[in-house]
Amino acid sequence: EASDRLHATNNFPEFTGRLCPAPCEGACVLGINEPPVTIKQVEVSIVDRAWQEGWITPVVPQELTGRRVAVVGSGPAGLAAAQQLTRAGHGVVVFERADRIGGLLRYGIPEFKMEKRHLDLRLAQMEAEGTEFRTNTDVGVDLTARELIDDFDAVVLAGGATQSRDLPIPG
């Protein structure tokens, strides 16, 4: 039941549980009299146990809509959109410019913060649900916007920021 509750509002609790800095723990009013609720550790423990016990399995849609959706970008936002759309019965193709799926989760988060095996487990689940992944596809270069519009019923743009940008704040 705990795993189901986590997944009801969060596609990827194994990512957020490891990566969130947990500011809520510092603000927890319970901390006035005793240690605050360690929600970050609770979340990680629940989802890790759920994977170990085999409680997290592919959720294959019972009915297909016949509609196709392109998702451009395979970072956390693109993956969450893809999983929800696939589970709703749409044919989903995720396009990724890089050679591997995951965006920031794959290339921006160091292994000591989140082992890539957690990402790979989730990607395998998504593939088993019916999500298709296409890597090495730079939309706008290898595939035009017109092709996406012509070939898909909807397009989700979930591209990440590949270059940093300084804020123009003096001092």
Give the positions of each predicted feature.
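Beta1-alpha1 glycine-rich phosphate/pyrophosphate-binding loop at the start
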Residues: 1-10, 32, 36-40, 71-139, ...
